[in-house]
């Protein structure tokens, strides 16, 4: 019967679509990368999603985040994303977690219940812990490397973490994961040399923070504020979603 996933089924087949509908994917970080990942996952037929993020939509998110509009500023990102998911597929099961994933909060999550984990967070400590937990649970995970300060969406590619180069975040991850005995990790990274942001205090979030009241992470507390565009993190998110869908559907 013709349905909203019929065009996708033409490529994957009925059996694969049923598998996607029964798959549960956890996406950590619902920002510029994670938001587009979730968008593509639900539109591709993933039936169960866990959204993890404690941040609220900020005016400065409008330049790149799919959930950011004037009407959503000040709302929790996971709540906005959940509403969007259910508007696309009312049958989807969505669990929201308003928390920032760190080693201290890991006990709140049972990774064994996930079929796939997406790491779309920025903090190295959180990324490492996510990888460790997923590997221990035997759950596939894909991790986003640096998407900030980049201008070339065509420079991103999928690779094992130990085959990456150029990306500063990937370099740190290689070192830290090697220390912990992690042998491999699928990542999306860029071979583009990062662009140095213009130092202009008038447009710096560090000196002119406009985060909504109650926002979890004040820009004034951040060491660096990376530059961003609409056409880079979105591409990273879509690449990640493609890898998740193809892996779960057995299309490799």
Positions of predicted regions on the chain:
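N-terminal charged helix/coil linker that caps or initiates catalytic domains
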Residues: 1-26
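Glycine-rich phosphate/adenylate-binding loop
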Residues: 2, 109-116, 126, 136, ...
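Conserved N-terminal Rossmann-fold NAD(P)-binding element of oxidoreductases
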Residues: 27-29, 52
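Hydrophobic/small residue at the entry helix of a nucleotide-binding pocket
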Residues: 33-34
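Glycine-rich phosphate-binding loop and adjoining beta1-alpha1-beta2 segment
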Residues: 46, 51-89
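Conserved SAM/SAH-binding loop
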Residues: 98-106
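Short, well-ordered coil/turn residues at beta-beta hairpins
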Residues: 120-121, 144
């Amino acid at each position: 019967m013709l349905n909203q996933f019929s065009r996708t089924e033409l490529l994957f087949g009925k059996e694969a679509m049923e598998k996607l509908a029964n798959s549960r994917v956890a996406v950590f970080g619902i920002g510029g990368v994670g938001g587009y990942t979730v968008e593509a996952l639900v539109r591709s037929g993933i039936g169960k999603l866990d959204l993890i993020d404690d941040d609220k939509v900020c005016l400065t998110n409008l330049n790149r985040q799919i959930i950011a509009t004037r009407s959503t500023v000040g709302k929790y990102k996971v709540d906005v994303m959940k509403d969007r998911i259910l508007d696309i597929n009312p049958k989807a099961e969505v669990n929201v977690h308003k928390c920032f994933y760190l080693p201290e909060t890991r006990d709140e999550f049972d990774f064994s219940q996930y079929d796939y984990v997406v790491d779309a967070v920025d903090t190295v400590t959180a990324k490492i812990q996510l990888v460790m937990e997923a590997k221990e649970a035997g759950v596939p995970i894909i991790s986003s490397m640096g998407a900030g300060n980049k201008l070339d969406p065509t420079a991103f590619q999928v690779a094992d973490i130990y085959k990456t180069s150029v990306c500063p975040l990937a370099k740190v991850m290689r070192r830290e994961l090697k220390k912990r005995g992690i042998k491999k990790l699928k990542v999306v990274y860029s071979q583009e040399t990062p662009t140095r942001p213009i130092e202009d205090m008038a447009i710096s979030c560090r000196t002119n923070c406009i985060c909504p009241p109650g926002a979890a992470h004040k820009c004034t507390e951040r060491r660096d504020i990376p530059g961003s565009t609409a056409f880079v993190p979105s591409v990273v998110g879509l690449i990640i979603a493609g890898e998740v869908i193809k892996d779960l559907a057995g299309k490799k």
